[in-house]
């Protein structure tokens, strides 16, 4: 079982400068390596305060120079918003400067707000994503490639800086689509999934969807890696827990607004947080998620691992305006106590 950090780089208000958010995110990635996490993932979003990282590859390249062993991943490159031939060149370059530590997460995107500002029809995102992934695979595997598709025409093209990892860096697809999951299994890619703030029942349903997708390609679930994105927090301090839950719910509210075009902003940038009918109470979130005392978090993680059987759990660390020093202590706590305890319990169960 691997553990990763997922770093969103959110800004909850102007009391946080954008520079401080980015610096805090980088600091969390560096500490993630020191604490023993296998991977640090960076999101991609645009034009608002939900997330301040416009290019996760830039974050990977920067953090590669500040770390030495941790894997560094894009979670995710939103393919319909890219020229794939340029993205290919950047992927090769970043894997080289990261000494072969790049984990390449890709997805189709979901925020209408972003697509409108790039002039891309979000209804066509799945088809554009599929074609872009075709192009990435050609460019990564072939010395010279061409492409003729519905959305793009590319003459014979060579990428000058090739990835160190052959034939490609590990590719992770973020999706809730069974069709896209099936493609991942067919082509040997990994999956990045989430149950949002739901509990074991949703994780069980998710396991069934993945199993069906794998089976449709004659595969077993274990034939590809599965990473679960999860909000987790361990503490005996009720105020800390409430602050983490509050920031997690803040992020979810903004995500839903950006997806459903309900976003409101007085200045065109900082989105107003609005309650929604999908909001969960703090008590429900505590019940559903690995949140609470150290023992409660360990026990809950083991339950969730038993249901979903993921290969990796990526915990959300940079949410809203949660206190940076407190989160750094939390990352250290995972390295000191939670990860070793979970690994020990899993080792006993497998023996």
Curated annotation (Swiss-Prot):
Kindly list the GO molecular function terms attached to this UniProt entry: monooxygenase activity; oxidoreductase activity, acting on paired donors, with incorporation or reduction of molecular oxygen
The domain of life for this entry's organism is: Bacteria
Protein keywords:
Monooxygenase, Oxidoreductase, Plasmid
List GO terms (cellular component aspect).
cytosol
Gene3D superfamilies from the UniProt entry: Luciferase-like domain (3.20.20.30)
Name the family the entry cites.
Belongs to the bacterial luciferase oxidoreductase family.
What is the name of the protein in this document? Uncharacterized protein y4vJ
